Amino acid sequence: MSLDKIMNEAISPWMKGDGPDSDIVLSSRIRLARNFKKYQFSTMQNEEETKQIQELFKKEFINKTVEPFGEFELLKMNELTPLQRRVLVEKHLISPNLAGTEYGACLLSESEHISVMLNEEDHIRIQCLFSGLQLSEALQSANQIDNWIEKEVEYAFDESLGYITSCPTNVGTGLRASVMIHLPGLVLTKRISRIIQVIQKLGLVVRGIYGEGSEALGNIFQVSNQMTLGKSEEDIIADLKSVIQQIIQQEKMARELIVQNSSIELEDKVYRSYGILANSRLIQSAEAANCLSDLRLGIDLGYIKGISRNILTELMVLTQPGILQQYAGGPLGPEERDYRRATLIRERLRIEKN
Protein backbone atom coordinates (compact mmCIF):
# COMPACT_ATOMS: atom_id res chain seq x y z
CA MET A 1 0.00 0.00 0.00
CA SER A 2 1.28 3.47 -0.85
CA LEU A 3 0.19 7.03 -0.14
CA ASP A 4 -0.49 7.49 -3.86
CA LYS A 5 -2.87 4.53 -3.83
CA ILE A 6 -4.72 5.85 -0.77
CA MET A 7 -5.06 9.27 -2.37
CA ASN A 8 -5.95 8.17 -5.89
CA GLU A 9 -8.43 5.43 -5.03
CA ALA A 10 -11.18 7.51 -3.48
CA ILE A 11 -13.48 4.58 -2.79
CA SER A 12 -12.28 2.47 0.13
CA PRO A 13 -12.91 -1.28 -0.13
CA TRP A 14 -15.39 -1.20 2.78
CA MET A 15 -17.60 1.24 0.81
CA LYS A 16 -18.11 -1.33 -1.95
CA GLY A 17 -19.78 -3.90 0.29
CA ASP A 18 -23.47 -4.60 0.81
CA GLY A 19 -23.97 -5.27 4.50
CA PRO A 20 -27.25 -6.04 6.30
CA ASP A 21 -29.98 -3.39 5.92
CA SER A 22 -27.80 -1.54 3.41
CA ASP A 23 -30.89 -0.04 1.74
CA ILE A 24 -31.00 2.35 4.72
CA VAL A 25 -27.80 1.84 6.76
CA LEU A 26 -24.73 2.98 4.83
CA SER A 27 -22.04 2.04 7.35
CA SER A 28 -21.20 0.99 10.90
CA ARG A 29 -18.21 2.35 12.80
CA ILE A 30 -16.54 1.33 16.03
CA ARG A 31 -13.98 3.57 17.71
CA LEU A 32 -11.95 2.61 20.79
CA ALA A 33 -10.18 5.37 22.74
CA ARG A 34 -7.00 4.30 24.56
CA ASN A 35 -4.16 6.03 26.41
CA PHE A 36 -0.73 4.73 27.41
CA LYS A 37 0.20 4.51 31.07
CA LYS A 38 3.72 5.93 30.68
CA TYR A 39 2.71 9.15 28.86
CA GLN A 40 0.71 12.23 29.80
CA PHE A 41 -2.64 12.72 28.05
CA SER A 42 -2.42 14.19 24.55
CA THR A 43 -3.86 17.50 25.77
CA MET A 44 -0.88 17.86 28.17
CA GLN A 45 1.88 16.25 26.10
CA ASN A 46 5.03 17.95 24.95
CA GLU A 47 6.44 17.58 21.45
CA GLU A 48 8.96 14.93 22.50
CA GLU A 49 6.29 12.59 23.89
CA THR A 50 4.16 12.81 20.75
CA LYS A 51 7.21 11.94 18.67
CA GLN A 52 7.97 8.97 20.94
CA ILE A 53 4.48 7.56 20.35
CA GLN A 54 4.95 7.95 16.59
CA GLU A 55 8.31 6.19 16.76
CA LEU A 56 6.84 3.37 18.86
CA PHE A 57 4.24 2.67 16.19
CA LYS A 58 6.77 3.03 13.41
CA LYS A 59 8.98 0.42 15.08
CA GLU A 60 6.35 -2.09 16.22
CA PHE A 61 3.44 -1.91 13.81
CA ILE A 62 4.20 -0.66 10.29
CA ASN A 63 4.61 -3.18 7.49
CA LYS A 64 3.08 -5.80 9.81
CA THR A 65 0.19 -7.89 8.50
CA VAL A 66 -2.98 -8.58 10.47
CA GLU A 67 -5.46 -10.80 8.68
CA PRO A 68 -7.85 -10.06 7.08
CA PHE A 69 -6.82 -6.39 6.93
CA GLY A 70 -3.41 -6.68 5.24
CA GLU A 71 -0.33 -4.59 6.00
CA PHE A 72 -0.35 -1.34 7.97
CA GLU A 73 1.25 1.93 6.94
CA LEU A 74 1.99 4.99 9.10
CA LEU A 75 0.93 8.38 7.73
CA LYS A 76 2.33 11.37 9.64
CA MET A 77 0.23 14.54 9.44
CA ASN A 78 3.26 16.83 9.22
CA GLU A 79 4.45 14.92 6.14
CA LEU A 80 1.14 15.34 4.31
CA THR A 81 -0.12 18.37 2.42
CA PRO A 82 -3.31 20.09 3.65
CA LEU A 83 -5.06 18.61 0.59
CA GLN A 84 -3.93 15.07 1.42
CA ARG A 85 -5.17 15.46 4.97
CA ARG A 86 -8.52 16.67 3.67
CA VAL A 87 -8.83 13.62 1.42
CA LEU A 88 -8.30 11.33 4.42
CA VAL A 89 -11.08 13.15 6.28
CA GLU A 90 -13.42 12.93 3.30
CA LYS A 91 -12.77 9.18 3.07
CA HIS A 92 -13.69 8.92 6.79
CA LEU A 93 -10.21 7.52 7.59
CA ILE A 94 -9.22 10.26 10.06
CA SER A 95 -11.08 12.89 12.05
CA PRO A 96 -11.02 16.62 11.20
CA ASN A 97 -9.38 17.10 14.62
CA LEU A 98 -6.46 14.80 13.74
CA ALA A 99 -6.04 16.51 10.36
CA GLY A 100 -5.39 19.77 12.20
CA THR A 101 -2.62 18.43 14.44
CA GLU A 102 1.10 18.84 13.76
CA TYR A 103 2.30 15.63 15.41
CA GLY A 104 -0.69 13.39 14.77
CA ALA A 105 -0.44 10.26 12.66
CA CYS A 106 -2.58 7.44 11.32
CA LEU A 107 -1.76 3.74 11.18
CA LEU A 108 -3.86 2.61 8.22
CA SER A 109 -4.63 -0.93 7.08
CA GLU A 110 -4.33 -1.95 3.44
CA SER A 111 -8.07 -2.68 3.31
CA GLU A 112 -8.84 0.75 4.88
CA HIS A 113 -11.28 -0.98 7.24
CA ILE A 114 -8.95 -0.10 10.13
CA SER A 115 -7.31 3.20 11.01
CA VAL A 116 -5.50 3.90 14.28
CA MET A 117 -5.27 7.63 14.94
CA LEU A 118 -2.27 8.71 17.05
CA ASN A 119 -1.95 11.82 19.22
CA GLU A 120 -5.49 13.03 18.68
CA GLU A 121 -7.64 13.71 21.78
CA ASP A 122 -6.33 10.40 23.16
CA HIS A 123 -2.99 8.67 22.51
CA ILE A 124 -4.72 6.31 20.09
CA ARG A 125 -8.18 5.91 18.64
CA ILE A 126 -8.81 2.60 16.90
CA GLN A 127 -11.46 2.94 14.20
CA CYS A 128 -13.12 0.11 12.28
CA LEU A 129 -15.56 0.64 9.37
CA PHE A 130 -18.01 -1.85 7.85
CA SER A 131 -20.79 -1.45 5.28
CA GLY A 132 -24.41 -1.84 6.41
CA LEU A 133 -25.50 -2.64 9.96
CA GLN A 134 -22.52 -4.66 11.23
CA LEU A 135 -21.75 -3.22 14.65
CA SER A 136 -20.88 -6.57 16.25
CA GLU A 137 -18.56 -7.49 13.38
CA ALA A 138 -16.87 -4.08 13.54
CA LEU A 139 -16.41 -4.42 17.31
CA GLN A 140 -14.84 -7.85 16.89
CA SER A 141 -12.33 -6.44 14.39
CA ALA A 142 -11.57 -3.39 16.55
CA ASN A 143 -10.94 -5.66 19.55
CA GLN A 144 -8.60 -7.77 17.41
CA ILE A 145 -6.49 -4.67 16.66
CA ASP A 146 -6.78 -3.52 20.28
CA ASN A 147 -5.33 -6.83 21.50
CA TRP A 148 -2.57 -6.66 18.87
CA ILE A 149 -1.48 -3.22 20.07
CA GLU A 150 -1.78 -4.08 23.77
CA LYS A 151 0.87 -6.78 23.37
CA GLU A 152 3.44 -3.98 22.92
CA VAL A 153 2.13 -1.20 25.21
CA GLU A 154 0.49 -0.84 28.62
CA TYR A 155 -2.82 1.03 28.62
CA ALA A 156 -4.00 3.49 31.27
CA PHE A 157 -6.63 1.39 33.04
CA ASP A 158 -8.41 1.62 36.38
CA GLU A 159 -10.04 -1.47 37.91
CA SER A 160 -13.16 0.44 38.98
CA LEU A 161 -13.46 2.98 36.15
CA GLY A 162 -12.10 1.09 33.15
CA TYR A 163 -10.03 2.72 30.39
CA ILE A 164 -8.92 6.25 31.27
CA THR A 165 -9.59 8.78 28.51
CA SER A 166 -9.18 12.53 27.98
CA CYS A 167 -12.93 13.11 27.72
CA PRO A 168 -15.02 11.92 30.71
CA THR A 169 -17.79 10.63 28.42
CA ASN A 170 -15.37 8.05 27.00
CA VAL A 171 -14.15 6.71 30.37
CA GLY A 172 -15.08 3.06 30.86
CA THR A 173 -15.01 0.96 27.72
CA GLY A 174 -13.67 3.87 25.64
CA LEU A 175 -16.14 2.71 22.99
CA ARG A 176 -17.95 4.99 20.56
CA ALA A 177 -20.25 3.07 18.22
CA SER A 178 -21.94 4.90 15.36
CA VAL A 179 -24.10 4.17 12.36
CA MET A 180 -24.43 6.23 9.17
CA ILE A 181 -28.05 6.09 8.09
CA HIS A 182 -29.97 7.45 5.06
CA LEU A 183 -33.38 8.84 6.10
CA PRO A 184 -35.05 10.64 3.16
CA GLY A 185 -38.49 9.24 4.04
CA LEU A 186 -38.45 10.72 7.54
CA VAL A 187 -37.16 14.04 6.19
CA LEU A 188 -39.82 14.24 3.43
CA THR A 189 -42.65 13.39 5.87
CA LYS A 190 -41.26 15.96 8.33
CA ARG A 191 -40.93 13.35 11.07
CA ILE A 192 -37.17 13.60 11.43
CA SER A 193 -37.19 16.28 14.18
CA ARG A 194 -39.43 14.16 16.40
CA ILE A 195 -37.30 11.07 15.76
CA ILE A 196 -34.11 12.96 16.65
CA GLN A 197 -35.70 14.20 19.90
CA VAL A 198 -36.61 10.62 20.86
CA ILE A 199 -33.10 9.39 20.00
CA GLN A 200 -31.51 12.10 22.14
CA LYS A 201 -33.78 11.27 25.10
CA LEU A 202 -32.42 7.71 24.90
CA GLY A 203 -28.91 9.08 25.52
CA LEU A 204 -27.72 8.86 21.92
CA VAL A 205 -26.22 11.58 19.73
CA VAL A 206 -27.28 12.57 16.21
CA ARG A 207 -24.74 14.35 13.98
CA GLY A 208 -24.03 15.03 10.32
CA ILE A 209 -22.01 12.96 7.87
CA TYR A 210 -18.57 14.05 9.18
CA GLY A 211 -19.40 13.93 12.88
CA GLU A 212 -19.58 16.73 15.43
CA GLY A 213 -20.49 20.12 13.97
CA SER A 214 -21.16 18.81 10.45
CA GLU A 215 -24.36 19.01 8.39
CA ALA A 216 -26.68 16.13 7.55
CA LEU A 217 -25.92 16.39 3.82
CA GLY A 218 -28.01 14.23 1.52
CA ASN A 219 -30.36 13.19 4.37
CA ILE A 220 -27.51 11.17 5.90
CA PHE A 221 -27.31 11.15 9.70
CA GLN A 222 -24.80 9.67 12.12
CA VAL A 223 -26.26 8.12 15.29
CA SER A 224 -23.90 7.14 18.12
CA ASN A 225 -23.72 6.34 21.83
CA GLN A 226 -22.61 9.06 24.23
CA MET A 227 -21.65 7.54 27.60
CA THR A 228 -19.59 4.39 28.12
CA LEU A 229 -19.06 4.23 31.90
CA GLY A 230 -20.92 1.42 33.66
CA LYS A 231 -21.91 -0.41 30.48
CA SER A 232 -20.22 -3.30 28.72
CA GLU A 233 -19.22 -3.13 25.06
CA GLU A 234 -21.90 -5.71 24.25
CA ASP A 235 -24.62 -3.68 26.02
CA ILE A 236 -23.62 -0.49 24.20
CA ILE A 237 -23.78 -2.28 20.85
CA ALA A 238 -27.07 -4.01 21.67
CA ASP A 239 -28.72 -0.74 22.79
CA LEU A 240 -27.60 1.18 19.71
CA LYS A 241 -28.55 -1.66 17.37
CA SER A 242 -32.02 -1.83 18.91
CA VAL A 243 -32.59 1.90 18.35
CA ILE A 244 -31.23 1.72 14.78
CA GLN A 245 -33.59 -1.15 13.96
CA GLN A 246 -36.51 0.95 15.19
CA ILE A 247 -35.34 3.89 13.06
CA ILE A 248 -35.12 1.54 10.05
CA GLN A 249 -38.74 0.50 10.60
CA GLN A 250 -39.84 4.14 10.92
CA GLU A 251 -37.99 5.02 7.70
CA LYS A 252 -39.60 2.11 5.83
CA MET A 253 -43.05 3.16 7.06
CA ALA A 254 -42.39 6.75 5.97
CA ARG A 255 -41.34 5.58 2.50
CA GLU A 256 -44.46 3.41 2.19
CA LEU A 257 -46.63 6.36 3.24
CA ILE A 258 -45.10 8.61 0.59
CA VAL A 259 -45.57 5.96 -2.12
CA GLN A 260 -49.22 5.47 -1.09
CA ASN A 261 -50.15 9.16 -0.82
CA SER A 262 -47.77 10.99 -3.15
CA SER A 263 -46.42 8.42 -5.58
CA ILE A 264 -46.41 10.60 -8.71
CA GLU A 265 -44.93 13.57 -6.80
CA LEU A 266 -42.17 11.36 -5.41
CA GLU A 267 -41.44 9.81 -8.81
CA ASP A 268 -41.28 13.32 -10.29
CA LYS A 269 -38.86 14.43 -7.56
CA VAL A 270 -36.63 11.41 -8.17
CA TYR A 271 -36.50 11.88 -11.94
CA ARG A 272 -35.95 15.65 -11.67
CA SER A 273 -32.93 15.00 -9.46
CA TYR A 274 -31.75 12.29 -11.84
CA GLY A 275 -32.05 14.77 -14.70
CA ILE A 276 -30.02 17.38 -12.82
CA LEU A 277 -27.28 14.86 -12.03
CA ALA A 278 -27.20 13.46 -15.56
CA ASN A 279 -27.14 16.83 -17.35
CA SER A 280 -25.73 19.59 -15.13
CA ARG A 281 -22.54 21.35 -16.16
CA LEU A 282 -22.10 23.03 -12.76
CA ILE A 283 -23.29 21.64 -9.42
CA GLN A 284 -22.45 22.57 -5.83
CA SER A 285 -21.81 19.93 -3.19
CA ALA A 286 -25.04 20.54 -1.22
CA GLU A 287 -27.23 20.30 -4.33
CA ALA A 288 -25.36 17.20 -5.49
CA ALA A 289 -25.87 15.56 -2.08
CA ASN A 290 -29.61 16.24 -2.11
CA CYS A 291 -30.03 15.01 -5.68
CA LEU A 292 -27.97 11.88 -4.95
CA SER A 293 -30.21 11.21 -1.94
CA ASP A 294 -33.29 11.42 -4.19
CA LEU A 295 -31.64 9.14 -6.76
CA ARG A 296 -30.74 6.57 -4.09
CA LEU A 297 -34.33 6.65 -2.81
CA GLY A 298 -35.59 6.13 -6.37
CA ILE A 299 -33.27 3.13 -6.77
CA ASP A 300 -34.38 1.62 -3.43
CA LEU A 301 -38.07 2.03 -4.35
CA GLY A 302 -37.61 0.57 -7.82
CA TYR A 303 -38.28 3.75 -9.82
CA ILE A 304 -34.75 3.75 -11.24
CA LYS A 305 -33.37 0.54 -12.73
CA GLY A 306 -29.84 -0.45 -13.72
CA ILE A 307 -27.93 1.78 -11.28
CA SER A 308 -26.13 0.46 -8.19
CA ARG A 309 -27.52 1.63 -4.86
CA ASN A 310 -23.90 2.17 -3.71
CA ILE A 311 -23.77 5.21 -5.98
CA LEU A 312 -24.85 7.51 -3.11
CA THR A 313 -21.94 6.50 -0.85
CA GLU A 314 -19.50 6.47 -3.75
CA LEU A 315 -20.39 9.85 -5.24
CA MET A 316 -20.83 11.54 -1.85
CA VAL A 317 -17.11 10.81 -1.35
CA LEU A 318 -15.90 11.31 -4.93
CA THR A 319 -17.48 14.76 -5.22
CA GLN A 320 -16.06 16.22 -2.00
CA PRO A 321 -13.81 19.29 -2.54
CA GLY A 322 -10.58 17.63 -1.38
CA ILE A 323 -10.91 14.55 -3.56
CA LEU A 324 -11.92 16.62 -6.61
CA GLN A 325 -8.77 18.72 -6.16
CA GLN A 326 -6.63 15.62 -5.58
CA TYR A 327 -7.80 14.22 -8.91
CA ALA A 328 -7.19 17.59 -10.56
CA GLY A 329 -3.62 17.66 -9.25
CA GLY A 330 -3.93 20.87 -7.27
CA PRO A 331 -6.17 23.62 -5.87
CA LEU A 332 -9.40 24.51 -7.68
CA GLY A 333 -11.63 27.56 -7.36
CA PRO A 334 -15.31 27.11 -6.40
CA GLU A 335 -16.59 27.21 -10.00
CA GLU A 336 -13.89 24.82 -11.20
CA ARG A 337 -14.88 22.38 -8.43
CA ASP A 338 -18.55 22.67 -9.39
CA TYR A 339 -17.66 21.98 -13.03
CA ARG A 340 -15.52 18.93 -12.22
CA ARG A 341 -18.15 17.64 -9.78
CA ALA A 342 -20.86 17.82 -12.43
CA THR A 343 -18.61 16.20 -15.04
CA LEU A 344 -17.65 13.35 -12.72
CA ILE A 345 -21.29 12.63 -11.82
CA ARG A 346 -22.39 12.65 -15.48
CA GLU A 347 -19.59 10.27 -16.44
CA ARG A 348 -20.31 7.95 -13.50
CA LEU A 349 -24.01 7.75 -14.40
CA ARG A 350 -23.18 7.16 -18.06
CA ILE A 351 -20.93 4.23 -17.11
CA GLU A 352 -23.71 2.77 -14.93
CA LYS A 353 -26.27 2.92 -17.73
CA ASN A 354 -23.90 1.31 -20.22
Swiss-Prot record:
A motif (RDXXRA motif of the pArg binding pocket involved in allosteric regulation) lies at residues 337-342. It comes from the Bacteria. It is an enzyme of class 2 (transferase). Appears to be allosterically activated by the binding of pArg-containing polypeptides to the pArg-binding pocket localized in the C-terminal domain of McsB. ATP binds at residues 27-31, 92, 125, 176-180, 207-212. GO terms for biological process: phosphocreatine biosynthetic process. It catalyses: L-arginyl-[protein] + ATP = N(omega)-phospho-L-arginyl-[protein] + ADP + H(+). GO terms for molecular function: ATP binding; creatine kinase activity; protein kinase activity. Keywords: Allosteric enzyme, ATP-binding, Kinase, Nucleotide-binding, Transferase. Pfam families: ATP-gua_Ptrans (PF00217). Its EC number is 2.7.14.1. One of its GO terms (cellular component) is extracellular space. Residues 24-254 form the Phosphagen kinase C-terminal domain. Belongs to the ATP:guanido phosphotransferase family. Catalyzes the specific phosphorylation of arginine residues in a large number of proteins. Is part of the bacterial stress response system. Protein arginine phosphorylation has a physiologically important role and is involved in the regulation of many critical cellular processes, such as protein homeostasis, motility, competence, and stringent and stress responses, by regulating gene expression and protein activity. This is Protein-arginine kinase. It comes from Bacillus cereus (strain ZK / E33L).
